[in-house]
Regions:
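A short acidic, leucine-rich amphipathic alpha-helix
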Residues: 48-54
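Core SAM-dependent methyltransferase catalytic element
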Residues: 336-357
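Short amphipathic alpha-helical interaction segments
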Residues: 57-68
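Conserved adenosyl
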Residues: 118-261
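Conserved Class I S-adenosyl-L-methionine-dependent methyltransferase catalytic core
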Residues: 14-33, 38-39, 68-178
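A short glycine-rich, Lys/Arg-flanked "PGG" loop and its adjoining helix->strand segment in the class I
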Residues: 260-272
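Long, low-complexity, charged/polar intrinsically disordered regions in eukaryotic proteins
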Residues: 1-17
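C-terminal alpha-helical "lid/dimerization" subdomain adjacent to the S-adenosyl-L-methionine
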Residues: 279-334
C-alpha cells in the first residue's frame, strides 16, 4: 500500500506490531547473552530460581523473562503452583533457533546485533546531525560475534556445494596448492569453510578489525585448519601483487569506505585472469518504495550498523547495506575489472553471489 493511502489507525497498528517485535528481539538478546536458552536446552526444564542458580543470574529477573517468553510463545510452562514453582521448558524448535549454531534456522545472533546498537544510539544521533560515523570497533563484541555466528551455518553447510556447482570456479579452487584470499574475513568461518572444501588450498584471510582477526585465528585453530588458514590484521592495499588464484569478499564490500581502492588492490593481488567472488545482500535491482521483507530488513541494518560504519572513515563513498548490483558493477569497473556476472547460486540465505574478473 502506498504510504499516502494509509489511515492513521493503520499506521498506528503497524507501529504497534513492530514495537512488539522489537521488544521480543531484545528479550532474545537477554536469553542468549545470559545463557538462559542454553541452560534450558542443555540442562532441561527449570523454575525461575533453578534457572537463576544455573546461570548466575537474579531469580526475579529470570522469572519475568520466563513469563514473557511463555506469553510470546517461545517457551512452554507447567502453570500449576506459585510463580516460582512453575516449570518452564524450551521446545525443540525454539532450542534450534536460539542455540544450535550449526542450524540454518539459528537466528539468536540477530538479537546481538541490535543489542550492540543500543549503547551506540546517542552516538548515532550525534553523527546523524554533524556527520561522521560509528565504527565496527565501537559497536563492540556483540556486533562482531553476531555477524560471525549468523553467517557461520551458511558457510559450513552451503558454501562448498554452492561453489562446486560453478564448474570453472570449482576447477580453479581445486588446483593443487591453490592460493585463496578472503577479504574482510571477520570471524573466519568463510575461510575455514573454503579450507575444508578445498583441502589442497592455502587460505589467507585479512581484516582491518584486529579483534576479528584474533577471533578468526582461534576459530581456525579449534576447527583444525590452522596449518592452512592464516589471518592477518591488514588493509588490502598492502597485499603482494599476483599472489592469489582466487579471492573472496563475503558480505563486506558494502561496509568499505573506499571499495574501489580495495577492489583495485585485490585485482592487483590476483594472478592474471583470476576471479574475485563477492557475496553481498540480495537486494532489488533498483530502489522502489514499499519494498519486500528483505529490503526492509537491509535498510534497518544500514541505518544502525553498516552505513555508520562505512562513514566512520574519511573519505567514504557511504554505500550502506543496500548495495544494488549496478553499484557493485560500477565499483568493479572503476577498479579495473572488465567482466561482471551474477553467479547462479540460489537459496543461499539473504545473499547474492557475483564474480568479477
Amino acid at each position: 500500500m502506498d504510504a499516502s493511502q494509509q489511515t492513521a489507525d493503520e499506521v498506528a497498528e503497524r507501529l504497534f506490531t513492530s514495537h512488539q517485535g522489537t521488544v521480543e528481539v531484545m528479550s532474545v538478546y537477554l536469553g542468549d547473552r545470559l545463557g538462559w536458552y542454553a541452560s534450558l536446552a542443555s540442562e532441561g526444564p527449570a523454575t525461575a530460581p533453578e534457572l537463576a542458580a544455573r546461570t548466575g543470574t537474579q531469580p526475579r529477573y529470570a522469572r519475568e523473562w520466563l513469563e514473557q517468553q511463555a506469553v510470546i510463545g517461545l517457551l512452554s510452562v507447567q502453570e500449576d503452583g506459585a510463580a516460582d514453582a512453575r516449570v518452564y521448558a524450551i521446545p525443540p524448535s525454539t532450542a534450534e533457533v536460539m542455540t544450535d549454531v550449526s542450524s540454518l534456522a539459528y537466528l539468536a545472533p540477530i538479537g546481538r546485533m541490535f543489542g550492540a546498537v543500543g549503547p551506540a544510539l546517542p552516538r548515532l544521533l550525534e553523527v546523524y546531525r554533524v556527520g561522521g560515523g560509528v565504527s565496527w570497533d565501537e559497536l563492540g563484541p556483540d556486533a562482531r560475534e553476531s555477524q560471525a555466528d549468523a553467517n557461520r551455518p551458511w558457510f559450513e553447510s552451503r558454501l562448498a556445494p554452492a561453489l562446486s556447482g560453478i564448474s570453472t570456479l570449482h576447477d580453479t579452487l581445486s588446483r593443487p596448492a591453490a592460493r585463496l584470499l578472503d577479504v574482510g574475513s571477520g570471524g573466519g568461518w568463510s575461510s575455514i569453510a573454503l579450507a575444508r572444501a578445498y583441502p589442497g588450498a592455502a587460505v589467507v584471510g585479512i581484516d582491518i578489525d584486529e579483534d576479528s582477526v584474533t577471533m578468526a585465528t582461534a576459530n581456525a585453530r579449534a576447527a583444525g585448519v590452522a596449518d592452512r588458514v592464516t589471518f592477518l590484521h591488514q588493509d588490502a592495499s598492502t597485499l603482494p601483487a599476483g599472489r592469489f588464484d582466487a579471492a573472496f569478499a563475503f558480505e563486506c564490500v558494502h561496509d568499505m569506505p573506499r571499495p574501489v581502492d580495495v577492489l583495485a588492490a585485490v585485482r592487483t593481488a590476483l594472478a592474471p585472469g583470476a576471479p574475485l567472488v563477492v557475496m553481498d545482500e540480495a537486494v532489488a535491482e533498483e530502489f522502489a518504495p514499499n519494498g519486500d521483507d528483505l529490503e526492509r530488513m537491509m535498510y534497518g541494518f544500514s541505518l544502525f550498523v553498516c552505513l555508520p560504519d562505512g562513514l566512520s572513515s574519511t573519505p567514504s563513498v557511504g554505500t550502506g547495506t543496500v548495495m544494488r548490483p549496478s553499484t557493485l558493477r560500477a565499483y568493479g569497473e572503476a577498479a579495473g575489472f572488465t567482466a561482471f556476472e551474477v553467479l547462479p547460486i540460489e537459496d543461499f540465505g539473504f545473499w547474492r553471489f557475483y564474480q568479477l574478473s
